[in-house]
Amino acid sequence: MDLQTFRKQIEKKLQRDGWTIRYDHKESTLRIEDKATKKGATLALKPLLAKWEREEYAAVDEALRTVAVGLESMAKAVHLNGNEKNIFPVIRAASFPDKTKDGKTLVYQKHTAETRIYYAVDLGETYTLITDELLNESGWELKALAEMATFNVRSLPQPFKEDEVAGNRFYFLSANDGYDASRILDQSLVQRMEQKAVGQLVAAIPHQDALIFADIENDTGYDVLGQMALQFFGGGRIPVTALPFIVENGQLEPVFIMAQKKPKG
């Protein structure tokens, strides 16, 4: 299928009353906006067409659903008060923007040299990142917001899958709720994993929907985790970092892992 035929199919699926769709021929993107809020999303067509040609139809449908749910959520008034149980931390790369596209400052705190902690209000199928404006409107302090979000993330389930490679154990958490990486902020979870580890505990948060713990007992384990983190990072919808973290007493230290060698901090 050629790009223009694909574009028309996508436009048809995203047709809604109150929305506008503009095509950027130079960038091969669609800009979908809500007429009332003037907010919207930009959809890159070439990567989407590539997925369709690989018969990854579910991925194409998910991208369209994300756009639709996102625009619908933008039209809703969001408040922190009354949503105390729906506030969660989200992990982002240190290079993630600190402002929204309409210039509002996002609330965040430093996490590691590679990562930041932002805060979000869960809206069911999506969430919205909390801005300074929203925080000030609530009358809350940042410390109270952070404590509430951290408390809530501890209440989330922790569905791990375990695998073993060359004497090293790997634990994969993937709940697909948007907060998989956020669970690294649950200190009780990190402590349990440290106590459980026979060798060196290493963690990876390659993208927002993945959290990996590894109990490393030999050089092969470091190499496998390094490759794994890089692969997950490249496949994530919202990448965080390809660098794993040495875990010591609950603290995370980013490390470079060279093939067949132990990491140097």
From Swiss-Prot:
Q: Which InterPro entries match?
A: DUF1444 (IPR010838)
UniProt lists the family membership as follows: Belongs to the UPF0354 family.
NCBIfam families documented for this protein = PRK13668.1
Q: What is the protein name given in its UniProt record?
A: UPF0354 protein ABC2771
Organism for this UniProt entry: Shouchella clausii (strain KSM-K16)
